[in-house]
Every structure is written in structure tokens, then in C-alpha cells.
Design a protein with these regions (language model features):
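A short acidic, glycine/proline-enriched capping/turn motif at secondary-structure boundaries
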Residues: 55-57, 84
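Structural recognition of the beta-strand scaffold that forms the well-ordered cores
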Residues: 3, 47-51, 78-81, 106
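Short, conserved loop/helix-junction motifs that constitute active-site signature segments
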Residues: 68-74, 98-99
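Loop/turn elements at helix/coil->beta-strand transitions in domains of secreted/extracellular proteins
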Residues: 43-48, 73-76, 102-105, 129
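N-terminal beta1-alpha1-beta2 submodule of the flavodoxin-like/Rossmannoid cofactor-binding fold
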Residues: 3-50, 57-59, 64, 68, ...
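Short, glycine-/small-residue-rich phosphate/pyrophosphate-handling segment
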Residues: 78-114
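Generic structural signal for well-ordered, non-membrane alpha-helical segments
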Residues: 1-2, 88
């Protein structure tokens, strides 16, 4: 979880003074602290789903400390994102590059109108063990 959670006002990307806008315009402010970087029993997971919203065409930067703080060696990593209008773009490959380890797969983008059935159908179609 994010230590200093974003409020609705923080997420107002149309306001140049909102938290996300300030962070977007100044990369040095994108170091978003997490309450915990590595999930419990991390070493037991073979497959990891990494979900995030798209902000300005890239993965939302709060996910960066999770990616940088974990070793994905020996893990299959499947990115997915949400966005009202942007596609997945290069976000998954940029995260894979940032991680430097793991077997990163093609990801999926879900629109704001996606249902739990849409997500379940995608996951079931991955034919994971």
C-alpha cells in the first residue's frame, strides 16, 4: 500500500497543482513510499500479476518502488492496467526493463467499464497452471 495515499483531489490530473500533476512535471517527486515493498511469502509465488492505472501513457509511478524493490527471478510476471482512454502501450515492457528480472508476459488493458467477467475471462484464457 502507498504510505501517503492519494485523495480524489490529488488525482485530479486536470489541476496543474494536484499531487499527480506536480509529480508528473517533476520526476524527483515520484518516489512514492510504500508501507511494505515485498508481499509476505514472496518467494512462494511463481506467477505475479502487476496491476496499475495508466498515468500520462505510462504505469502509475507508485508501482515503481514495488518493481524496484523485488527480485522477479524465476517468476512469470503478467502486467495489466486500467485506463479510460490510453492503451497498455509500452508500460509492461518499461516495467520489465525496470525490474531486470522475471519472465514478463504480454499484458492487458481494461477500460473503466470492464466487468469482473471481463477480467475473469482474460485470466482463464491465460491457461495458467
Amino acid at each position: 500500500c502507498i504510505r501517503d495515499r492519494y485523495t480524489s483531489d490529488d488525482l485530479n490530473w486536470t489541476d496543474d497543482n494536484s499531487r499527480v500533476s506536480v509529480e508528473h512535471n517533476d520526476e524527483s517527486k515520484r518516489d512514492v513510499k510504500l508501507t511494505k515493498t515485498t508481499p509476505d511469502n514472496w518467494e512462494q509465488y511463481d506467477t505475479v500479476f502487476v496491476g496499475y492505472p495508466i498515468w500520462w501513457g505510462i504505469a502509475a509511478w507508485p508501482v515503481n518502488n514495488f518493481i524496484n524493490g523485488n527480485d522477479f527471478s524465476g517468476k512469470t510476471v503478467i502486467p495489466f492496467c486500467t485506463s479510460a482512454s490510453s492503451g497498455l502501450g509500452e508500460s509492461g515492457s518499461l516495467l520489465a526493463e525496470m525490474a531486470g528480472t522475471g519472465n514478463w508476459q504480454d499484458g492487458e488493458r481494461f477500460s473503466s467499464g470492464a466487468s469482473s467477467d471481463n477480467v475473469a475471462n482474460w485470466v482463464n484464457g491465460l491457461e495458467l497452471k
